[in-house]
């Protein structure tokens, strides 16, 4: 669906942000991208819908060159992006006005705009906030409004750039559940974060460091890789605990490291068995 070919990009001071990135994002997959601050993951995310253009190489979105300025509108119909701070995306005085902004720019008829707004409000469970100011909502609710706004454009791929980093744990969980449901309905998801705890549900994970992809694979392999600490990343606590238990011949299955409750249930089952 999206292909990056030898993509390189430098900051204005000449510091490399991306160096020779080659990557294929498959339709319908959930791709997690992790790395410490300054690793290049956000810069990579911005290249996926043309908000950044490569200084070398190409980004191809369903056969369209995302670096071609004349094709940007087509690219952004396919790939939508939600940022860390939702307020940067708010335009309207009310939630429904904000959601209508994108479809209006596509010059869609009013009946189609109304359908898309209503559908997005229902999808993200925001109907009761329809007439509220988006800026009056909590951080988690605001992030859901930003997500709903992108959904009105009906993109095939959704890019989430550190969307839970400014949220409390409960709000972050709400947003992650919404994203998971969208993936289950067929959306392609690209999710950047420095919090490895959030990527258990991904199909594939990339680890970035200093503008390069240094590790890639399925979550089970990447999240337990001993090199993560050398890259400034903290492995998920339950996976670390499972690794410690393994040394004592207590095997916790990968599926049961996804949440404290499932981990505890598996541990109890193993002890009762003995």
Swiss-Prot record:
It comes from the Archaea. ATP binds at residues 35-42. It is a peripheral membrane protein. InterPro entries: AAA+_ATPase, ABC_transporter-like_ATP-bd, ABC_transpr_CbiO/EcfA_su, ECF_ABC_transporter_ATP-bd, EcfA_1, P-loop_NTPase. GO terms for molecular function: ATP binding; ATP hydrolysis activity; ATPase-coupled transmembrane transporter activity. SMART domains: AAA. SUPFAM superfamilies: P-loop containing nucleoside triphosphate hydrolases. Residues 2-235 form the ABC transporter domain. Keywords: ATP-binding, Cell membrane, Membrane, Nucleotide-binding, Translocase, Transport. Gene3D superfamilies: P-loop containing nucleotide triphosphate hydrolases (3.40.50.300). It is found in: Cell membrane. It is an enzyme of class 7 (translocase). Its EC number is 7.-.-.-. GO terms for cellular component: ATP-binding cassette (ABC) transporter complex. Its main location: membrane. Transmembrane segments: none annotated. Belongs to the ABC transporter superfamily. Probably part of an ABC transporter complex. Responsible for energy coupling to the transport system. This is Putative ABC transporter ATP-binding protein MM_1037. It comes from Methanosarcina mazei (strain ATCC BAA-159 / DSM 3647 / Goe1 / Go1 / JCM 11833 / OCM 88).
